[in-house]
From Swiss-Prot:
<feature type="domain" description="EF-hand">
    <location>
        <begin position="53"/>
        <end position="88"/>
    </location>
</feature>
<feature type="binding site">
    <location>
        <position position="66"/>
    </location>
    <ligand>
        <name>Ca(2+)</name>
    </ligand>
</feature>
<feature type="binding site">
    <location>
        <position position="68"/>
    </location>
    <ligand>
        <name>Ca(2+)</name>
    </ligand>
</feature>
<dbReference type="InterPro" id="IPR018247">
    <property type="entry name" value="EF_Hand_1_Ca_BS"/>
</dbReference>
<dbReference type="GO" id="GO:0042056">
    <property type="term" value="F:chemoattractant activity"/>
</dbReference>
<keyword id="KW-0479">Metal-binding</keyword>
<dbReference type="Pfam" id="PF00036">
    <property type="entry name" value="EF-hand_1"/>
</dbReference>
<dbReference type="InterPro" id="IPR034325">
    <property type="entry name" value="S-100_dom"/>
</dbReference>
<protein>
    <recommendedName>
        <fullName>Protein S100-A15A</fullName>
    </recommendedName>
</protein>
<dbReference type="GO" id="GO:0005509">
    <property type="term" value="F:calcium ion binding"/>
</dbReference>
<dbReference type="GO" id="GO:0042802">
    <property type="term" value="F:identical protein binding"/>
</dbReference>
<feature type="binding site">
    <location>
        <position position="70"/>
    </location>
    <ligand>
        <name>Ca(2+)</name>
    </ligand>
</feature>
<dbReference type="InterPro" id="IPR002048">
    <property type="entry name" value="EF_hand_dom"/>
</dbReference>
<dbReference type="InterPro" id="IPR011992">
    <property type="entry name" value="EF-hand-dom_pair"/>
</dbReference>
<dbReference type="GO" id="GO:0046914">
    <property type="term" value="F:transition metal ion binding"/>
</dbReference>
<dbReference type="Pfam" id="PF01023">
    <property type="entry name" value="S_100"/>
</dbReference>
<dbReference type="GO" id="GO:0006954">
    <property type="term" value="P:inflammatory response"/>
</dbReference>
Length: 108
């Protein structure tokens, strides 16, 4: 049985994390530089749409996710980052739907 699209997406997330984590130091964690590269290379549309490409945003996201304050992002902390980005993108999607609906129905 082939993987479903969601299963394939989950595998890709795991692979992406390990691909970038292997660039320097600990192969099971991301440094700030590895996280920046991962986000800007792998989810550029999310970052652009959310207005999140600024280095300070990624640095703050790193600090918020680094729960144990070891200056590394483990996989669980990475999932927190992905969750935040997906929630922000989902909210943006709903804002666009509302704006489209309001425009179509002359509510502005």
């Amino acid at each position: 049985m082939p993987d479903t699209p969601v299963e394939d997406s989950l595998f890709q997330i795991i692979h992406c994390f390990h691909h970038y984590a292997a660039r320097e130091g600990d192969k099971e964690t991301l440094s700030l530089e590895e996280l920046k590269a991962l986000l800007l290379d792998s989810v550029p549309r999310f970052m652009d749409t959310l207005g999140r490409r600024q280095p300070y945003y990624i640095t703050e996201l790193f600090r918020a996710a680094d729960k144990n304050k070891d200056n590394q992002i483990c996989f669980d902390e990475f999932l927190y980052i992905l969750g935040k980005l997906v929630k922000d993108y989902h909210l943006q999607f709903h804002r666009q739907l509302c704006a489209h609906y309001c425009t179509e129905h002359s509510l502005y």
